[in-house]
Amino acid sequence: MPGLLRARRTDAVRLDAVTTFHLRHGVEVADALRVGRPVVALESTIVSHGLPRPDNLRVAREIEQTVRDAGAVPATIGMVAGQLVVGLDDAELTRLATVDDVAKLSVRDLAVAAATDADGATTVAATSAVAAAAGIRVFATGGLGGVHREAAQSFDESADLTTLARTPIAVVCAGVKSILDSGATLERLETLGVGVVGYRTRRFPGFYLTDGGFDLDWSVDSPEQVAAALAAQEQHGLHSGGLVVANPLPTDEQLDPALHDRTLAEGLMLLRREGVTGKAVTPFLLAHFHSATEGASLAVNIRIILRNADLAAQIAVASAARQA
């Protein structure tokens, strides 16, 4: 396939029925996978599209350090010059954080991006698929994509959901982004057979908010319980999909609910007025939150991803211990 580069630590990996990609592993990640050390996958979209500069690069490094501090190896995934990299080094991370034309890559975009030697940041869907193909079972992100509001008219639903239906990975998140339809997203996850467990809660979190307003059937109380669930899934062989681990913010760290609701209503009105659709919806609304809350939402967003990175690392450590 044109545009694919070969470098150290390169493996051919089949992501679907028709396309074979070459994954280049960072040295630290390759060594960790070889000897069975715990590894946590991290997305790169938060670096290139999710956070403003210069916070994006600083926070990306903090996320990786949080994973290390909890005993695991971070594997930030992205595409550099057409090649999928599992474990971006600091120069590659800096490149995706500072270059202006970094593409936002879901699973469907990977082939064309590779063929055109593109730089790209992977979404939850693409990161999950690549991580699972590389043998990584735990992934930390901020919020899951989901069913958009008014999806009955727009059919706008994140590929995160259908990808998780066929991808064996645990995704630690603070629920779905509160700009989405949480109830409809939970219904779709149920239909698709994707497990959802609350971490020390029976309520689905609302990203910026501790409580998103919906009950959950299952709750786990420790990283070891999540690791046991992943092991049972693999051993029983009854389901090859993902597991959403919903990790809510403590109530004293959430965004003020009244401010959240007011900002969301204003953002949705602006969205309709300006005709924003598709991939542009989420970054548009997140930017509105950042502006309207005078940076408060950004601070909450950063706390979310750091807390999720820490929990994901603990789960990866517990999973590795079970296999030792």
Swiss-Prot record:
Domain of life: Bacteria
GO molecular function: hydrolase activity, acting on glycosyl bonds; metal ion binding; pseudouridylate synthase activity
Xref: InterPro entries: Indigdn_synthA-like, PsuG
Purpose of the protein: Catalyzes the reversible cleavage of pseudouridine 5'-phosphate (PsiMP) to ribose 5-phosphate and uracil. Functions biologically in the cleavage direction, as part of a pseudouridine degradation pathway.
EC number: 4.2.1.70
Biological process according to GO: nucleobase catabolic process
Positions that bind Mn(2+): 156
Cofactor note (record): Binds 1 Mn(2+) ion per subunit.
Self-association and partners: Homotrimer.
Pfam family, one: Indigoidine_A
Family in the record: Belongs to the pseudouridine-5'-phosphate glycosidase family.
UniProt binding sites for substrate: 104, 124, 158-160
Protein name: Pseudouridine-5'-phosphate glycosidase
Cofactor requirements of the protein: Mn(2+)
Source organism of this protein record: Salinispora tropica (strain ATCC BAA-916 / DSM 44818 / JCM 13857 / NBRC 105044 / CNB-440)
GO cellular component, one term: cytoplasm
Catalytically driven reaction(s): D-ribose 5-phosphate + uracil = psi-UMP + H2O
Record's keyword terms, sorted: Glycosidase, Hydrolase, Lyase, Manganese, Metal-binding
